[in-house]
């Protein structure tokens, strides 16, 4: 959300983990607007952070998947995800729905917004959804790759730059939740600052490479971990791909790739 909003507007965005906000609240100005993101709308830390925000008279928006939840009732504004109930352990539908709502929010906050921009955004999201469906249909290929790179491994690392780094953090969380493999996400440029010492022969590295302006830099990071014997699995896209990349996504608007 921070990356999206700051790229579209002149607004400064600060991100807080709800549990940290609740115990060490930042100094909030009257001009501050607080956005709460919660799948259930019932997370205790988020509820406490909202209580603090309300006590200071600061306006707020809750992005949630559950109509009538505590956060949706006690906030000033609510954006419902309409993603349906999460059945799996990991939140997947709600997460991608949250990203989509944040995209619309970033456009809505622009000083000047053309109607054609919103229409184009809707079209891009619809096209991306169709491409995501194709990936789901081809899940057997993904299963084979997972078996080749991850089965029997103690740990795994995700690397990326820009928005790919953001996705690497969420991807690592998903892998931990579902497989109990120790997984972490790192910014590609930070590998040399200690993290690379954890990489040994056969360590799985999932490299996300969809950001065009940092593509070659991430390729350098891939070579660094390859030199240490890492087993590398690359997800790239048309325009950043190389011949041996395991998954190459189709050409889309770059802001769609986190989905």
Where on the chain are the PLM-derived regions?
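Glycine-rich phosphate-binding loops that contact phosphosugars or nucleotide phosphates
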Residues: 1-127, 161, 208-243, 248-254
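Active-site phosphate/pyrophosphate-binding segments
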Residues: 77-204, 214
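C-terminal functional extensions of proteins
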Residues: 257-259
